[in-house]
Amino acid sequence: YSFTDKQGRTVLTRQMNNSEEHDTYYIYNDKGNLCFVLQPKYQESADLGKYAFQYEYDARGRCTKKILPGADFVEYTYNAADQLVFSQDGNQRAQATKKWTYYLYDKFGRLTEQGECTNKSATSSPVVYIHNYYDGYGFINGTGFTDSNYKLTEAQKAYGKGYQTGSVISIFGDSKKIYLMYQYDIQGRVVKTVQNNLLDGLDVTETTFTFSSNPQTVVHKNTYKENGTQKSITETYIYTYDYADRISKVEHTLNDTKVVLSENTYNKLGQLVNRSLHGASADIMGYAYNIRNWLTRIESPNLILKLNYGYSAGGGNIASMFWKSGEEGRQKYTFTYDGLGRMLNADHLILGQQDEDDDDWGVTTGLMSIQTGRQIEETPLARENAFTERVTEYDKNGNILKLVRYGQTGANSYGVIDNLTMTLTGNRLNRVDDASTASAYGGGFEFKDAVKQDNEYAYDANGNLTQDLNKGIEDIQYNCLNLPRLVKFKDQSTITYTYAADGTKLRVEHKIGNSTTRTTYCSNVIYEGGTAKCLLTEEGYVSLDDREYHYYLKDHQGNNRVLVNKNGGVEEINHYYPFGGVFASEENVQPYKYNGKELDTKKGLNWYDYGARQYDAALGIFTTVDPSSEKYYPTSPYVYCGGDPINRIDPTGADWYKDSDGNYHWAERGGDIAEGWTWVGSSVSIEISKSKYVNYYENGGIKIRNDKPNFSRMESYWSWL
């Protein structure tokens, strides 16, 4: 439900969890500016500081103060042209010498400089973080742009007018800077980028385009110094397209050795039906869909995955998932949801063996095939609830209050390994108590309840996690982008992060006991201790010590299920709990796992790096506030995917839009949004009959239509293809 006033402003949105109302209220001032948004939890506990978004405005209607739930206020100052020139958040205000972020613009309103200063004065000791250049290339004669790769002919400079041509970006905690240059062609397409890296080298990327402006060739050269010797890595991508401009083949050349990285085949409906890796020698992936264009099956020699959908008021959520990885046995999850589409139960089965041709895959007697409705033959069942995960209670903002997780407790035994009760202060986690006495066998994935006290978790003024006593973390420090700078453990072990001022992660250093390891990220090349370790490709990675190709076999969410070599040999198998924990995996040769994100397990950290935030899969929460939380008002800014990790993935940056005909579309932010479409949000509740609703969420491009064809529900899942 959405309620509006006489001026068409939304004053209430209501989502129904069966008969329970989840209400979000919107309050405006006399000038029509939004002043308060009261989350559903506010209706139970009227605390503005914990459960309200708050805004203040000046006489010109510009927001001068903003408060997110559980965070200190952010202050904004504008110039006469209504441009933001200063901002200050809670962490900047809490420093001994208060800091402000400042912004400078050119006469066209383009950001030219951003940094920090000590007060709102042009002479207040500014520290420049980002300096942008436009229209020309005079800057390449300055400091930092001395390499010949930055030099352009007069003809090459001619097409930079109207575009950003370069940047100088500071590196937090390092005296070095990133010097970046863009070169354009006559159509305004970037044909060359040059930037330096932390290893005294450069990353140079040159691109040619097809007539329809799709990349045709991409040549990337990475140079670096290793033990004082200059070395280089050169890779080339060649893209081939079919008549509909869909990628049909991707070739990859690494230092003059060419392979066919992938080949795609599509059916007459435009659906991807086959995908071969490494010229089909690594794997051939087949894809099947139902009449609604939803993905139902992925099948290859090393990964089989089947999805069944429920057709109740849940709106087509995934009801069960079968899979088989490598030579291992079949497994199944059966999912149930509450009225808001949040996961309640993910019941796990290890299935008995069954004929490969039986499409219904070993389900116990009494269950009905979701697709056919017929009775399924009984088959041997090896184990129930081996790796079940259940959320037994949410609050009205979607925060998990109780979670039960099953796992392996012995060589041949399984049981409850986590029986968690979360205590919150507002949306912030304060304490976790584990009632289970069993532990995961062999040091497997589980929550470690190391202490039992109040305030096990602490936060700074911006809502960033600064203490996790259950992991032995006594302090977490952040840079001005709310990205971690230092994680300090009780035993004085540390993890130090190096970021550029634009948020790019450049280096991570682990000091654990007497051991120090350093990982450096230079574009898609990863270095360990200054030695090139691997090169990430569109389908996996190349290990640079032996120049061998490795390929990820992904499921519908982009989770890396199986790692194979160029000959199809299985090198790693990963199985996941719904919220991302890794269980019962074979080998562990690389860190990219759930959603394809990097997992850091050192010192028991167990964080997934999602770029803007770190994610703790044991608790199903992020460590910092969602930077886009104002687009998801009813939901806690810490929860993962609104409590639905089955049908959603967080990093897609997608939302619901409504067109002029009243149809709802799922579209990428920044993508092709048609004229007349209006933003709805991450979810939409539609009345299908009196007092009955269908809630649609971030789970793909379903289109509630009048008379037009449906979009693919799995569209957002396939953004990684």
Please provide the spans of the model-predicted regions.
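Extended repeat-based solenoid scaffolds, especially LRR ectodomains
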Residues: Y1-T4, T123-D185, I291, L305-G314, ...
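A motif-centric feature for acidic-aromatic and gly/ser/thr-rich catalytic loops and repeats
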Residues: F36, Y42, F211, L305, ...
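Short turn/helix-capping motifs enriched in Asx and small/polar residues
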Residues: N567-V582, K603, G611-R613, A617-E687, ...
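Beta-turn initiation residues at beta-strand->coil junctions
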Residues: S2, K6, L12-N18, T24-Y26, ...
